[in-house]
């Protein structure tokens, strides 16, 4: 795996690898759900914003965590791959940072700037990696904001090197408050047993908009009578934590991440308890559809996830579904879409 820097690859090389490649692709009522997932139903909505899309070219970026990942995702994924995965869907995407090596934060930002400026892919905005507790966080934000595509920051909180309570340290809170001042969001991706920290974080930073990733990293197996493997938490502890978080008006929830822990043969009914609890708890104005592609491939294809979510939400009001599939992402992230 090569670790490039801005000094040894050109804009043209990057766009050839990512943006130009995309053109080649062109040659609450879960009881009544069907248990199979069909391949290509109609799109669930006339406009879809995927609020959580990953892209990584391992010739450009070093992702330490990917070295021990499942072979399904331990490879490069380009805009062309995403276009193929979303064929037939009226979808645009918000890039989500991919936990690159520490010395590549600015490089990732530059690559995304060039990709988005090319206007040749479905990706039109970005949530970038950042270190809120870093002394140079303000300068980093200025550099990223100058690129014009930044909507928010994420700093992974569930990696083994990050101790519990990191997001509540004084310097971290200072950085999060700065995001609020600059009208930028913070995506929270945290261990499910530490969700109560999100309540404190949101309380301490009331002027910052938070987006909780992946239904709080819920493990859908917790709701199965006989799961194939032990879930990461109990159903009740996750439910109570999510209810506490939802009381904070400055936290929204991404509806995603529920397919990944599932074993082969899952059905929409298996996912419905987690999805419906989030939709009901956060309300129709604070939920966002997200794919988590390509990480979702650990449990199913992007289209399978879209189809399942469409079935789970089919009985909800059309206005609520419009908010889920696109409108909320546009408003919460301040998107030009």
Predicted segments, located by residue:
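Mid-to-C-terminal alpha-helical segments outside catalytic/metal-binding sites
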Residues: 2-4, 8-51, 60-84, 88, ...
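Active-site neighborhood of phospho(di)ester-bond hydrolases with catalytic His/Asp-centered motifs
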Residues: 49-51, 96, 127, 154, ...
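Conserved, mostly hydrophobic/aromatic
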Residues: 52, 93, 126, 179, ...
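Active-site gating loops and adjacent loop-to-helix segments of metal-dependent hydrolytic enzymes
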Residues: 57-92, 146-163, 208-209, 216-221, ...
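Alpha-helical scaffolding within the catalytic cores
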Residues: 76-82, 137-139, 196, 235-242
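Active-site gating/metal-coordination segments in enzymes
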Residues: 103-194, 200, 216, 232-233, ...
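Short, electropositive alpha-helical surface patch
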Residues: 103-119, 208-212, 270-280, 305-312
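Catalytic pocket-lining loop regions of alpha/beta-barrel enzymes
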Residues: 165-288
């Amino acid at each position: 795996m090569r670790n490039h820097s801005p000094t040894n690859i050109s804009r043209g090389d990057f766009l050839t690898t990512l943006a130009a490649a995309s053109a080649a692709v062109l040659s609450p009522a879960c009881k009544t759900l069907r248990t199979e997932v069909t391949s290509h139903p109609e799109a669930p909505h006339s406009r879809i914003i995927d609020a959580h899309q990953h892209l990584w070219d391992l010739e450009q970026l070093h992702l330490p965590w990917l070295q021990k990942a499942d072979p399904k995702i331990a490879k490069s994924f380009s805009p062309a791959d995403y276009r193929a995965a979303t064929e037939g869907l009226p979808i645009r995407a918000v890039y989500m940072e991919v936990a690159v090596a520490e010395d590549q934060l600015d490089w990732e930002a530059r690559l995304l700037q060039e990709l988005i400026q090319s206007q040749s892919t479905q990706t039109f905005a970005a949530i970038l990696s950042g270190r809120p507790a870093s002394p140079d966080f303000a300068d980093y934000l200025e550099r990223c904001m100058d690129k014009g595509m930044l909507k928010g920051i994420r700093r992974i909180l569930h990696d083994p090197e990050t101790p519990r309570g990191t997001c509540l340290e004084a310097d971290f809170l200072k950085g999060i408050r700065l995001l609020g001042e600059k009208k930028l969001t913070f995506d929270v991706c945290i261990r499910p047993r530490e969700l109560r920290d999100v309540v404190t974080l949101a309380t301490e930073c009331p002027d910052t908009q938070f987006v909780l990733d992946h239904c709080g990293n819920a493990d859908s197996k917790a709701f199965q009578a006989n799961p194939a493997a032990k879930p990461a938490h109990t159903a009740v502890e996750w439910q109570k934590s999510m209810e506490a978080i939802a009381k904070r008006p400055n936290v929204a929830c991404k509806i995603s991440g529920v397919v990944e822990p599932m074993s082969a043969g899952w059905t929409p009914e298996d996912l419905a308890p987690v999805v419906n609890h989030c939709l009901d708890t956060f309300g129709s104005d604070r939920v966002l559809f997200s794919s988590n592609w390509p990480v979702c491939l650990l449990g199913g294809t992007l289209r399978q996830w879209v189809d399942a979510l469409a079935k789970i939400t089919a009985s909800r009001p059309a206005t609520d579904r419009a908010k889920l599939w696109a409108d909320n992402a546009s408003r919460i992230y301040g998107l030009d879409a």
